């Protein structure tokens, strides 16, 4: 069966409360005495009554046709999460007539499209709504229909309302009908454009009760900028949101949008890959964007793992790859901008602050200062030929932390290049200026406003389910989770058009989703539009389940990207926090869409050559032809997969990294004892029996079987793992299965990773195929490091699907409010058609 797809929310004018669990919503209308509306006599007070004559019947029936149809029971129109008992049947209240004005408690007059407080439970803040309908029911009761605003604390960010301005609320599409007497107080809510400059405050917001610049849609917890036409429609029917400064703000946003569209016309974009690993996420994003017609290029990448950086640089020689921490990278970006300002390449209102930056005073005769350095040991004088690099941190762990320049010395080659602190090169201003100007022109480092897309998955060891020592109470205090703060700080500094963050689904589970809520709140604080969802790798053409959390961000001038719907059938597994279950990207249950069959292990790796436990070669040749569409596609070289027409016959299809972790002699002997059949594991070893409750134990009275080394065949850790209930230790995979999740380790001690027919664990290449890496994607480092690179990666087909959605949004091709996007038929194995000049 296919997983369920959630329907987008639509208008619902029933008596049903807001359908999303645990989110603040008005209560059902209270029961009132069933009596017709009477004329108010002098001295008599009623809780609520309508004013003026009713709206003409023809106009009312045209505006609210459902109110005048015969009474019938039908399912609700709006749905955002899984159905509850209250969703089964809802009766639409039939109207006798509609009104434009009402008075409550003989003191407060309300008109259509007014904003108001609505009574809530005792001791709780009142609800906030826009009145979109007022009518007398056929039963004689008085009603109004509310379209609800959400306070920040009522949204997915919850406690991180502290990051949001106090008066800010979010407009939803959720509507329901309540008794008129529940109206409590009239409000002044300003509908304003979402401003990219978070430091700029529109003066009119100081005198209002609340202001609203974003919609909040429950499906996929989407925060989207209010469109200008929406504000105009509201202002036409209301006296609010008409201040001159608000209109000017809207015009400013419009100008930004037009400028963005001119840039988009070139269909080119730059990408920064943070925590890049070996580059899977950016590789997939660029592949998918290209299929949408956008030429997305990974211009910069950062990771602290040297082996991963080498892998990325080899496969993407066009990328500026930096092996450094994200913290140091942020410091470097700030110092680079200062240098650009100092050399008048970039404007700044405080440019005078950088006049003597690092001792590089802007004096003309500074060029006469010697650019030489004397070696104290032998008296040799070195002359700076040119500056060839820049870095921040502690190069080779030898010097103090700071900004360093890489120097090429006159009459020496690059093997003698050295890193020198910039303060020691203050007499080389001319050389530094030359380097900075060349670097600025070529874009060796991104500058604020100069990046189109930032992607990355901040390290998740502190929240991963594979980490048994997680800080459950305050995850942001865990040093392993601090990178989430750094990631958001880099986004805030660079202000890219689009942001895509990836992480494990445990981000939603641990501490009630604390870190995920923080990430959403932080992006909203920066005035990014936001959408989050979960995607399973197997639903996009892999023999691996691998569910991951993704968070989109987009500037107000852009369209927030959608999530791509699955291309392959897949049965979902695992437990998801109830509140986020509806955020899984999937089709509705019972849908009629024809999805491709799910891929199995045999579809993915059956064509690979047999290798032994001791195999160490980095390159080998194929000995079989591919037999499945996946195998044919994954073998394509980069030039073939990119749609290039210039196929070099001299290039051969090479298979990289098809060698397994070389197991020690004891583990190898154990693997050889695992039967070659489905479901086999250590429980098949001699002397192991399964007792009550599926708990394993050793057979009593029998001597334990020993290995050649003298150690026991059945290790104690296998008997005690998960209290003896696990079947994972030394588990053998089978051809008709899918892998739950490719991880960073290859030891078979507590996972099912043994090859179906060979006495070894899955090779690095087999794991890489399960992640969707092309066969020609070469990895670097020791075997364990290669497994880590593959296990930490975002599945390439998932990133490819997201790249297509990104490209569609970037080019302004996304239409409608649906948070989900249908991919083209055959997308999984689709190759782009390049223009002739690029082919």
From Swiss-Prot:
Entry coiled-coil feature ranges: none
Main subcellular localisation: nucleus
Outcome recorded upon mutating residue 470 to K: In cmt3-10; partial loss of activity
Pfam families (alphabetical): BAH, Chromo, DNA_methylase
Active site residues of this protein: 460
Chain ranges of the BAH domain: 108-227
Phenotype caused by lack of the gene: Reduced DNA methylation (e.g. CHG cytosine) at least on FWA, QQS and SDC loci.
Catalytic activity: a 2'-deoxycytidine in DNA + S-adenosyl-L-methionine = a 5-methyl-2'-deoxycytidine in DNA + S-adenosyl-L-homocysteine + H(+)
Occurrences of domain Chromo (ranges): 382-447
Start and end residues of each SAM-dependent MTase C5-type domain: 269-813
Result after altering residue 542 to F: Loss of activity
Annotated segments matching region Disordered: 1-38, 51-86
Post-translational modification: Ubiquitinated by JMJ24, subsequently beingargeted to proteasomal degradation thus initiating the destabilization of the heterochromatic state of endogenous silenced loci.
Effect the entry attributes to changing residue 724 to E: In cmt3-4; loss of activity
UniProt xrefs under InterPro entries: BAH_dom, BAH_sf, C5-Methyltransferase, C5_DNA_meth_AS, C5_MeTfrase, Chromo-like_dom_sf, Chromo/chromo_shadow_dom, Chromo_domain
Compartments where located: Nucleus
EC assignment: 2.1.1.37
Phenotype for residue 279 to E: Loss of activity
Composition bias, Basic residues: 19-30
Subunit structure comment from the entry: Homodimer. Interacts with HP1 and, through its chromodomain, with the N-terminal tail of histone H3 doubly methylated at 'Lys-9' and 'Lys-27'. Binds to JMJ24.
Descriptive protein name: DNA (cytosine-5)-methyltransferase CMT3
Protein's organism: Arabidopsis thaliana (Mouse-ear cress)
Taxonomic lineage of the native organism: Eukaryota, Viridiplantae, Streptophyta, Embryophyta, Tracheophyta
